[in-house]
Amino acid sequence: MTLKILRSSLLAFSAALLLACGGGGGGGGGGGGGSAAFGAAGTASGFGVNGGGSGGAGDGGGNAGDGSASTGGAGSTTTAATGGGDDSGVGSGGTGVSTADAVGIGAVGGLGSIIVNGLRYNTDSASLSIEDAAALQIGMTARVTGPVSLDFTTGVATQVVSSADLRGPMLSVDTAAGRFVVWGTTVTTDAATVWADAPGLAAIPLGTTLQVWGVPAEPGVLRATRVEQRALAVPIVTGTVQNLNTTLRTFTLGGLTVNYGLAVLGNAFDSTPLANGAIVRVRADVAALPGPLTVSLVQPWYPVPAITGVAVQLGGVITDYAGSGSFRVLGTTVDASSAQITGGPPGSLGDGVKVEVAGIMANGVLKVSKLKLRNIPGTGGPAAFTLIGTVGNFVSPASFQVRGQPVDASGASVVFGNGTAANLGSGAAVTVSGSQIVNGTLIAEQVVFR
């Protein structure tokens, strides 16, 4: 008993010390190499399916990114972040931590450290594993591990993992509805979808190969958080497993039949078999249209820890809604009956609503203390992106960068704080916010000099 108490005290002290030492934003990853196997300490081993969702943890899913010589893809980057010194004070003077192995999963909403689901993480000492892109950018989905404050506003990332969620040709499109289809998956968009190299969906020709980051919604549907056009590249598909046939070694993801007979399964499947309802990401070495997709890798999508007492924050779309006390986000059962709800009226909760939730796991259920509505079908919702850092590559208020992200702050309605547009220039310390990224450029709505 004495040893257990001592161990708990040391763990809490270590986590608090990490937060107290925070302060500056992290840099991006550089270099090449394969992705590191992923299995965060403190998460459940195996890949649990809690009545249709993804549980468990311990991805460990091989090195089969598409950056190998055989595929010529973007590859992956695994590195320790280097401090950029953004003077953010992230984690300093914090209100305490829940657990040292807290997990956040969602789309990146800001840079300077990084912001995921409104929680700002210091990434100075984080291990970064980024696949399918050269660096982490706004709109990419990610899983962040590390201690957080009790109010879920700041944290210290120890590990950041990010991969693309869908890649393939756009085979059909409904621009009026803001949706398209890739590999049998219906991709929906909203005001917060980042368009990396196009003004919007209407500007992308049918048949274009797209790389999409997004959060799984109902089976066969992905809510896009970032869309990029790509040259021909091998497929990636993310979705909920249905129609699993362990004899034929096939299952479906939306309208796509997947053959996994020759695939490498992520280490998480060693303890808990692949099952219907699991959310997975699959990769193939070659594309085959039409017909089943033969994949080379099947791995759990960013796994959610199921251990009681672990702090978890998720950004995703509500499914299986049965009331505020029972619904799912990213396959995880959520109880928001006692949550503080912001961003819209509580009566707006329901299937298809995009939310951010934060709380503590208890017997496989995420008991949330905070819930923010981000998008309500037919109504919309708040979209906000944030950059914290110094101005670089300044040409004019219409063309500069912060944290490598292009910014346009030339609009007549841009609000400046602690200065004016005349104070913009390379080296200026700023916080920039806006609600749209079009053609890869953040359209600034507010610039505050720091």
Question: Language-model segments: what does each one mean?
Answer:
Residues 2-4, 18, 22-123, 130-412, ...:
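Short, flexible, surface-exposed loop segments at domain boundaries
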